Amino acid sequence: MSEKTTAQERNHRKVREGYVVSDKMDKTVVVAVENRFKHPLYGKIIRRTTKYKAHDEANIAGVGDRVRLMETRPLSATKRWRVVEILEKAK
């Protein structure tokens, strides 16, 4: 019992990378994340895109930026991700 620590240990949080496709909302960006996988039977590489709404507290991400997202608690009805860092600014 003495092995308990006073600081709560965080669970593993999912991390995704994608491109900002919309920044028209206040403190929110829409990020398109591409998922590539091989078809189990035919072997073709398939690209699937998922769009996540992510929290951007400082409104610094713009359309075309490559960003890293991290999963967080639900911030609204559809927002469960937050922008951790901007990996590459749009040209």
UniProtKB/Swiss-Prot annotation:
Cited Pfam families: Ribosomal_S17
InterPro entries (UniProt xref): NA-bd_OB-fold, Ribosomal_uS17, Ribosomal_uS17_bact/chlr, Ribosomal_uS17_CS
Coiled-coil annotated residue ranges, if any: none
Family assignment from sequence similarity: Belongs to the universal ribosomal protein uS17 family.
UniProt organism field: Thermobifida fusca (strain YX)
Keywords recorded for this protein, A-Z: Ribonucleoprotein, Ribosomal protein, RNA-binding, rRNA-binding
Source domain of life: Bacteria
Protein name: Small ribosomal subunit protein uS17
Gene3D superfamilies: Nucleic acid-binding proteins (2.40.50.140)
Subunit composition and interactions: Part of the 30S ribosomal subunit.
Annotated signal peptide: none
Function: One of the primary rRNA binding proteins, it binds specifically to the 5'-end of 16S ribosomal RNA.
GO term, biological process aspect, one: translation
GO molecular function: rRNA binding; structural constituent of ribosome
Cellular compartments per GO CC: cytosolic small ribosomal subunit
